[in-house]
Amino acid sequence: MRISILTIFPEMVEIVKKYGVISRAIKNGILEIEIFNLRDFTNDKHKTVDDYPFGGGPGMVMKPEPFFNFFEYYKERYGNTYTILTSPQGDRLTNHLVKELSEKESILIICGRYEGIDERVTKFVDREISIGDYVLTGGELPAMVIVDAVSRFIPDVIDKKSVEQETFNTGLLDHPHYTRPRNYKGLEVPEVLLSGDHKKIEIWRRKMALKKTMLKRPDLFLNKDLDGVDKVALLDLFRELINNAK
């Protein structure tokens, strides 16, 4: 898969290529990340990318010319590519949307700055995406979040089973995790995890995931279809709650 990013701060975005599973995926030829500097597509010697807004108001607006120049160059090089604009007014980034993006052959992410981009540039945009109901100084961090989230669903980037069991992919929050030592400052690892009984461990983990979801994100149950393991775990959890209430 190819992911392209257009930004005025390429050095900031470059860091996403250097660490962890994304770095390995690039080295293994699974993922290609290409970063473009919008200033390289300006028409003046000062490489100006912003100007004052028509109608007045605070801040600056990103000029249309560099974007149009870039898209002419990019389309000639790669053809039509699914194009995303990072924007606080865009669709909320969700697990479902991340999976949808990961199935595309290539995506292009446009990083906004200042008060925003000239509205005429949006003619090239297929989808605006927001990572939350808050405003950042620019679109570089959202672009990096999108790259990280999407790359996890690309085949062979990480273990398929790990992705399948992750929070939101199962419709539940994740269960608690433990590692050695077994006892640390009087804090014990739950005995069931040391039992070697894989069925009991699976039910315990699902029970803990259900409990955590009910307490922290009950809204997730609205879209959750409970399977057999869920029902057994939920029944076990209810029994535990009833016994504790006695």
Curated annotation (Swiss-Prot):
Pfam families: tRNA_m1G_MT (PF01746). One of its GO terms (molecular function) is tRNA (guanine(37)-N1)-methyltransferase activity. One of its GO terms (biological process) is tRNA N1-guanine methylation. Keywords: Cytoplasm, Methyltransferase, S-adenosyl-L-methionine, Transferase, tRNA processing. One of its GO terms (cellular component) is cytosol. It is found in: Cytoplasm. InterPro entries: Alpha/beta_knot_MTases, tRNA_m1G_MeTrfase_C_sf, tRNA_m1G_MeTrfase_TrmD, tRNA_m1G_MTases_N, tRNA_MeTrfase_TRMD/TRM10. The keyword DNA-binding does not apply. The keyword Disulfide bond does not apply. It is an enzyme of class 2 (transferase). S-adenosyl-L-methionine binds at G112, I131, G132, D133, Y134, V135, L136. PANTHER family: TRNA (GUANINE-N(1)-)-METHYLTRANSFERASE. Homodimer. Specifically methylates guanosine-37 in various tRNAs. NCBIfam families: PRK00026.1 (NF000648), trmD (TIGR00088). This is tRNA (guanine-N(1)-)-methyltransferase. It comes from Thermosipho melanesiensis (strain DSM 12029 / CIP 104789 / BI429).
